[in-house]
Structures are given as C-alpha cells and as structure tokens.
Amino acid sequence: MIPLPLQMVEAGLRLVDADLSDGTSGNLSVRGPDGTVLLTPSSLDFRLLTELDLVKVDLRSGEAHGRRSPSSEWRLHALAYEKRADVNAVVHHHGPWSTAAAV
C-alpha cells in the first residue's frame, strides 16, 4: 500500500495534470485517526510538493506541526470534518471550469 503522504502528493499532481489546478490553487487534506488532519501547505505548487511539506493540524486546538504553514483554508477543511463524520478527505480546488461555472 502506498503511504498516505505520498498519495496526497500524487493527488496534487493529478489535479495539475487534469488541468483542475495551476499548481498553487487549491489544497488537499486527509483526516487522521487522532483528531488531526494532514494538509497541504500554503502557497506551494503541487509540482514541488513533497511528503515533508505536508502539515499536521490538530482539529481541536488549530496547532500546526510541520516545516511549513498550513493552507490558509485549513478551517474550511476542519469544518467539513466537524460537520461530516463520514468525510475522511477534502479536495478543494479552483479549476478554471468550476470557477467559470460559479461566476
């Protein structure tokens, strides 16, 4: 089985490859078993993302652990996890087609 952090890196690359992200627009997170979330960092191109760049955020305290800052939209992810116990991952992107449809 592929380790979760590597799966997140690969998911970011798939967003870029599918033209759903220019590389820096959007973020990914996965719920951890211990009340935390593993999140992509702020302002880092998915093409440059490594497993070491991911940030662990405690959903209760908001405390972040990692060498980078978490996505500025981490609270959006936290709210999704709070409201939906059945949700274990969030993909938030600003792809050109979805953005055009929203306008």
Q: Language-model segments: which ranges?
A:
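An anion-binding catalytic pocket shared by soluble metabolic enzymes
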Residues: 2-91, 98
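Class I SAM-dependent methyltransferase SAM-binding "motif I" and its flanking Rossmann-like core
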Residues: 96-103
